[in-house]
Amino acid sequence: MQINIVPEFKNDRDIDAVKSIINNCVHCGFCTATCPTYQMLGDELDGPRGRIYLMKQMVEGAPVTEKTQNHLDRCLTCRNCESTCPSGVRYGRLVDVGRRYVDERVVRPLSQRVQRWLMRETLSRRGIFSFLLGVGRSVRPFLPATLKKKIQLAPSAGQWPAATHKTKMLLHVGCVQPALMPNVDAATARVFDKLGVELVIASDAECCGAIRQHLNDHHGAEDQMKRNIDAWWPHVENGLDTIVINASGCGVMIKDYAEILAHDPAYADKAKRISAMAKDVSEIMPTYAAQIGTLAQNKRQSATPERVTYHPPCTLQHGQKIRGSVETLLSGLGVTVRLCQDSHLCCGSAGTYSILQPALSQELLGRKLTNILKTEPQEIVSGNVGCINHLQSGTDVPVRHWIELIDRMI
């Protein structure tokens, strides 16, 4: 797809990437077959190919309107299209930049600007989010049903391991998960402890930057990325070489630090190192599969469910291209693991999407849960805090992180 950039965009730092990505698109349309919003709305402009046309027209000088903004807003950034594309079009990177271009040229209504500011300043700040979540939980009985389902009561985190080990890895804890689901980090730490690995938390590390990045506050996102690098770097210099991530939405973001900060001479090399160190917990566990199997056999936990349905997060299967490792690990422990029909499709959480596009998000949730419940699971497991919370809001079947299942078994 040839492209002729107008002078207005030629000096933008991301325009070379935009041009390269658009040039790779051969407009074959394979992406539309797996795009959730195209399937729901049936509009070419609500599929990846149509959105690429809109972004191409924009940088070639076509007027940028609310119509362009709305079609890009409705994209989940699930990156299912990237898994389908035979040409390797990096659509997720393109739409992030395209949204920034649009927001720099189309002023949003005041209500949208306020909503997005509130999300940026609360969800991405651990202390503020924790406080507000506590307030929400205290008034939960009086909240509307849809909001009540989103604000679950605080789960018990259990004991954090006190032992120290020679082998150490960093654990990224992020912004939302410590308050919303502290049990996930604690379970992760216990599993690694039993495997002889101590997880270290850098106290000054914060949100990975994904929330601000996807809400088009790219400068704010990059500031958070740099602060994280600064927080982790002393540990890197002390020999730690792995950052364990148990929220795949954070993982896909941290793995992109290298590209996003490539323009910054003070951080480019460090960002490249950090991205290489970032590992989803599902990338690490297979190394310890035999040890986990022995521990599980010795414990013989009768409370372990016999049948679970695994929902692979989009940020894991499409964003990080990690597939099959969770199912293989759990199956090796004797758990019957099922995938539902259309397991490649998004559940509708998609970070802040469930807040910004509630109708589309709820339709996707309904479709996903209909397919999941057909598998008759005793538990539903996933690997991302947003997916877990979103799925749990629509069903009484327990939804947990799969690492919690491992924690119970060993």
Label every PLM stretch briefly:
Residues 1-28:
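Generic N-terminal leader/targeting and pre-domain segments
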Residues 60, 84, 216:
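Short His/Asp/Glu-rich catalytic/ion-coordination signatures at enzyme active sites or charged loops
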Residues 14, 91-410:
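Iron-sulfur cluster-binding electron-transfer modules in prokaryotic oxidoreductases
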Residues 29-33, 43-47, 199-201:
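N-terminal glycine-rich anion-binding loops that anchor highly charged ligand groups
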Residues 1-10, 37-70, 88-117, 400-406:
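Non-heme iron-sulfur electron-transfer modules
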Residues 33, 53-57, 70-73, 79, ...:
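N-terminal, well-ordered alpha-helical segments
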